[in-house]
């Protein structure tokens, strides 16, 4: 995982020395498409994503739920992220860059801004007409996809309904800080103190979610919402990846009946299932983080995957 500095690629891991061993995620820089007047146009936008990344996964889920596969084209990165960051080099599940012809994701960023400085991440929502990055913040891209294409043929369904927004926002805030990002804060910590600061709140949140789901089918109200969509990619990767690779090993999701049920329900959803590729995700995490797993060995297990999943999912 490197970064661009004034448009020049640098292969550099995260700096944790200046933060006491803590992993600090930088904010996304492209935040367009959120104004009230924004309307989607079929064929105008292109998504850069990948099966490994949980942030991209939530966007792939929303794209599928809204039936936008024909309206928003996609490129999918290689599982392996090495000295050049994310790539479109040939490999399993890769969909080449048909828009900018990039071999490396950083070339998409420099196509938008030759002097860009910052991390090079997915997902990216690219505007083909203006030849620029519209947005690279996953939480905002899913909001765009949720409603911006409703008047041009998207499937019905509002996953951020007005009546539930305060509750969705409340759950999202805790889940992001302690769980979605918490697994990274645990896994990329370089001091014991920083690791434990992330570790214990993570499991407090899992315990809280398990209790919250008692007698409930979904996190908010009686329907699938954005809160479930944002939680699911972390849960689906947890036992096979985060439990071992990121040292989040107090409990498994399999030890939480209600959370396991939620995973099974979404993993078996006809539109969500094709977005899951656990084999690809395992290959990425275990093979692309030499500071965490120097040998690059990919574990075979778990022996009993979560409901709706297989080791080849």
From Swiss-Prot:
Effect of loss of the gene: Disruption mutant does not have GS-hydroquinone lyase activity, is more sensitive to PCP toxicity and has a significantly decreased PCP degradation rate.
EC number: 1.8.5.7
Key word S-adenosyl-L-methionine present: no
Ranges in coiled-coil conformation: none
Domain named GST C-terminal: residues: 161-285
Single GO term (MF): oxidoreductase activity
Annotated binding of glutathione, by residue: 86, 119-122, 137-138
Keywords from the UniProt entry: Oxidoreductase
Cysteine-cysteine disulfides: none
The reaction(s) this protein catalyses: 2-(glutathione-S-yl)-hydroquinone + glutathione = hydroquinone + glutathione disulfide
Keyword Oxidoreductase: yes
Pfam families, per the entry: GST_C_2, GST_N_2
Name of the top EC class for this enzyme: oxidoreductase
Active site: 53, 184
Top-rank taxon, per record: Bacteria
GO terms for cellular component: cytoplasm
PANTHER family per record: GLUTATHIONE S-TRANSFERASE OMEGA-LIKE 1-RELATED, GLUTATHIONYL-HYDROQUINONE REDUCTASE
Job description of the protein: Catalyzes glutathione (GSH)-dependent reduction of glutathionyl-hydroquinones (GS-HQs) to the corresponding hydroquinones. Can act on halogenated substrates such as GS-2,6-dichloro-p-hydroquinone (GS-DiCH) and GS-trichloro-p-hydroquinone (GS-TriCH). Involved in the degradation of pentachlorophenol (PCP), a toxic pollutant.
Family: Belongs to the GST superfamily. Xi-class GSH transferase family.
Subunit structure: Homodimer.
UniProt protein name: Glutathionyl-hydroquinone reductase PcpF
Species annotation: Sphingobium chlorophenolicum
